[in-house]
Amino acid sequence: MKKVCIAIVLLLLMSASAYAENMKIRFGILPVIDTLPLQVGVQDGLFEKHGIDMELIRFASALERDTAMQAGQLDGYFGDLVATYLLINQGVPMRIALTSWRTTPGYPMFGIALSPANKDRDMGDMKGRTLGLSKSSVMEYLADKMEDHLGVNRGHFSLLEIKKIPIRLQMLMTDQVDSALLPEPLLSLARLKGGGTLATAEKLDMPLTVLCLHDKYFADDAEGYAKFIAAYKEAVQRLADSPEKYRSLMAKTCRIPKPLMSEFPVYPYPMPSLPSAAELDEVQTWMVEKGLLKVKVPDETALSPIIP
């Protein structure tokens, strides 16, 4: 009987250890190139190696992703800072874990595409012409920051609300809108199909997208956060060491159009870091000005308490 009891205790201890080593994370993503390190981490078993059972939940739209996060169906989230602050302000218990993409010269993530009829116009020519985007979102924030960077007054463009990006691209290519704010690789696709590129956000020197985790992963000495960061770092390093190895994965998971599959670059993803207090304040100041926030969210509420 004593041996049986010892065996049961050992079995329970082993089960508890296995449970502790395999932390479940349901992570909401969009099929965009910012999320490639997450895809590498899952494909190569890096999250599993660090004791995380990572499930990437793909959403067709940011609205669907945000709804799932609000409903408590997700443990983590990929998104932009504007959407992130809106969710945290609405009571979603999550924190910014790391910056997934910063604007990087030579690697545009967003830009203003020109319709075929306007492809040869410059910034001065575009004054008062339509710019398709999603208002009250990171797209409008980027448009404002790009106007500042390019030395024109805010309101240089006539903003036209076109929420769905595929429709925005279609209207651009059929000359129903003069220009459109598009993410890559659609910015390159528009140029390939006869449009132009007026400007990109690559030199704005700002965080564009972030990864967030539920508050629970920052408890108990932030063990869950540490495991997540360790796996993510390995994924970023593998992409840096052998980018071409992951071209097919990028094409499959990040919606790279067939005409661009062989030549679209594998981007140099940044090692985990947090946005600065000044960068976060700049985003929130804009959100308050636009009426998206009444008061700013404290960094102590929104940001990881630990530097990755």
Residue ranges and their predicted role:
Residues 7-15:
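Bacterial N-terminal signal peptides
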Residues 1-4:
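Positively charged n-region of N-terminal signal peptides that target proteins for export
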Residues 82, 156-160, 164-249:
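Pocket-lining segment of extracytoplasmic ligand-binding domains
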Residues 16-20:
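Sec/Tat signal peptide C-region and signal peptidase I cleavage site
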